[in-house]
Amino acid sequence: MQQIMVSGTVAFLVSIFLTPVLIRYFTNRQLGQEIREEGLQSHLRKRGTPTMGGIAIIAGIVVAYVFTNILAMIQGVGGFTVSGLLVLGLTLGLGATGFADDFIKLYMNRNLGLNKTAKLVSQLAIALIFGFLVLQFPDENGLTPASTHLSFIRDIDTIDLGFGGSVFGIIVFLIFIYVVVSAWSNAVNITDGLDGLAAGTTAFVMGAYTLITFWQFRNSCDTAVEAGCYTVRDPLDLSVLCAAGLGATLGFLWWNAAPAKIFMGDTGSLALGGLVAGISVVSRTELLMVIIGALFVIEIASVAIQIGVFKTRGKRVFKMAPIHHHFEALGWAETTVAIRFWLIAIMAVLAGVGVFYSDWLHLAEV
């Protein structure tokens, strides 16, 4: 528990103090967010607001994770693990993609940033590397960071995406990992359209997973094989990483809350999406994450529905997509939408954690 608290605190401090440095840097160089003319008129006032604040979030996560594990190694109570490093690598890889996108927008005056092909290839390569590596590095018990089984609260034994390790099965698994990584990174990116919305929602999700992975650590099958135990390779280190994600997003949210002094940009949203995706895979809770991260699911689903219906029927389901803009178009104030969506996110988190804990109670009583 001490490691988790240290990680969250360090991440928060790094993020909350580094963010204003970035605000001053980008403001002095007159580098800010461009706002589309065809968008909501109320958002035009945000033109010129500094972006790329995700740098502070990533820095907070990295510094906290590294510092906490070095401290743990000195104290002889833990250290870096393969699972944590792989998720961190996924986060950094997608963060680098987002950074390139933001850099092109700001410094090369190309408002669309990376072209779709470059972004797709980058996400695909990062996801495939992550998907391959999470099946490597077995521990002394033969447990790898992830398995080819689909997972809800733990692996679902009857659904093996790897088809017993066949070449076809591994390809199917890698495709699945790409879908997971792409979906979550784009979902967080799409949600980042209102002041504080993506940062706040991610903080709720990371808070939930800090508890979930710590509970997996306390009830690990490595220490005692009993009803309700969890076969997760490195749950404590994952909890440390989740706490870093929680602290970093809260520190950034201090400056990103309405009216935002800075936006996280693709640098932050893609990185946080990678963190969400990676944690769901290595904690073996891919389907549970759909409940806990339901607001992200709603946001990306609204875009898919809008595009699908418009292309097939020539009609729009929402006034604007993603759905948070729909409510703004109805006349809701931006802060009203953000806070109500936070409430939805909190309810989703509570529901997901409740399902997780109820499962353990049920198995523990059997």
Curated annotation (Swiss-Prot):
<keyword id="KW-0961">Cell wall biogenesis/degradation</keyword>
<comment type="similarity">
    <text>Belongs to the glycosyltransferase 4 family. MraY subfamily.</text>
</comment>
<keyword id="KW-0479">Metal-binding</keyword>
<dbReference type="GO" id="GO:0051301">
    <property type="term" value="P:cell division"/>
</dbReference>
<dbReference type="InterPro" id="IPR018480">
    <property type="entry name" value="PNAcMuramoyl-5peptid_Trfase_CS"/>
</dbReference>
<dbReference type="Pfam" id="PF00953">
    <property type="entry name" value="Glycos_transf_4"/>
</dbReference>
<feature type="transmembrane region" description="Helical">
    <location>
        <begin position="341"/>
        <end position="361"/>
    </location>
</feature>
<protein>
    <recommendedName>
        <fullName>Phospho-N-acetylmuramoyl-pentapeptide-transferase</fullName>
        <ecNumber>2.7.8.13</ecNumber>
    </recommendedName>
</protein>
<feature type="transmembrane region" description="Helical">
    <location>
        <begin position="238"/>
        <end position="258"/>
    </location>
</feature>
<dbReference type="GO" id="GO:0046872">
    <property type="term" value="F:metal ion binding"/>
</dbReference>
<comment type="pathway">
    <text>Cell wall biogenesis; peptidoglycan biosynthesis.</text>
</comment>
<feature type="transmembrane region" description="Helical">
    <location>
        <begin position="54"/>
        <end position="74"/>
    </location>
</feature>
<feature type="transmembrane region" description="Helical">
    <location>
        <begin position="197"/>
        <end position="217"/>
    </location>
</feature>
<feature type="transmembrane region" description="Helical">
    <location>
        <begin position="161"/>
        <end position="181"/>
    </location>
</feature>
<keyword id="KW-0131">Cell cycle</keyword>
<keyword id="KW-0812">Transmembrane</keyword>
<keyword id="KW-0132">Cell division</keyword>
<keyword id="KW-1133">Transmembrane helix</keyword>
<comment type="function">
    <text>Catalyzes the initial step of the lipid cycle reactions in the biosynthesis of the cell wall peptidoglycan: transfers peptidoglycan precursor phospho-MurNAc-pentapeptide from UDP-MurNAc-pentapeptide onto the lipid carrier undecaprenyl phosphate, yielding undecaprenyl-pyrophosphoryl-MurNAc-pentapeptide, known as lipid I.</text>
</comment>
<dbReference type="GO" id="GO:0009252">
    <property type="term" value="P:peptidoglycan biosynthetic process"/>
</dbReference>
<dbReference type="GO" id="GO:0051992">
    <property type="term" value="F:UDP-N-acetylmuramoyl-L-alanyl-D-glutamyl-meso-2,6-diaminopimelyl-D-alanyl-D-alanine:undecaprenyl-phosphate transferase activity"/>
</dbReference>
<dbReference type="GO" id="GO:0008360">
    <property type="term" value="P:regulation of cell shape"/>
</dbReference>
<feature type="transmembrane region" description="Helical">
    <location>
        <begin position="118"/>
        <end position="138"/>
    </location>
</feature>
<keyword id="KW-0460">Magnesium</keyword>
<dbReference type="Pfam" id="PF10555">
    <property type="entry name" value="MraY_sig1"/>
</dbReference>
<keyword id="KW-0133">Cell shape</keyword>
<dbReference type="GO" id="GO:0005886">
    <property type="term" value="C:plasma membrane"/>
</dbReference>
<feature type="transmembrane region" description="Helical">
    <location>
        <begin position="287"/>
        <end position="307"/>
    </location>
</feature>
<keyword id="KW-0573">Peptidoglycan synthesis</keyword>
<keyword id="KW-0472">Membrane</keyword>
<keyword id="KW-0808">Transferase</keyword>
<feature type="transmembrane region" description="Helical">
    <location>
        <begin position="262"/>
        <end position="282"/>
    </location>
</feature>
<dbReference type="GO" id="GO:0071555">
    <property type="term" value="P:cell wall organization"/>
</dbReference>
<keyword id="KW-1003">Cell membrane</keyword>
<dbReference type="GO" id="GO:0008963">
    <property type="term" value="F:phospho-N-acetylmuramoyl-pentapeptide-transferase activity"/>
</dbReference>
<dbReference type="InterPro" id="IPR003524">
    <property type="entry name" value="PNAcMuramoyl-5peptid_Trfase"/>
</dbReference>
<feature type="transmembrane region" description="Helical">
    <location>
        <begin position="76"/>
        <end position="96"/>
    </location>
</feature>
<feature type="transmembrane region" description="Helical">
    <location>
        <begin position="3"/>
        <end position="23"/>
    </location>
</feature>
<dbReference type="InterPro" id="IPR000715">
    <property type="entry name" value="Glycosyl_transferase_4"/>
</dbReference>
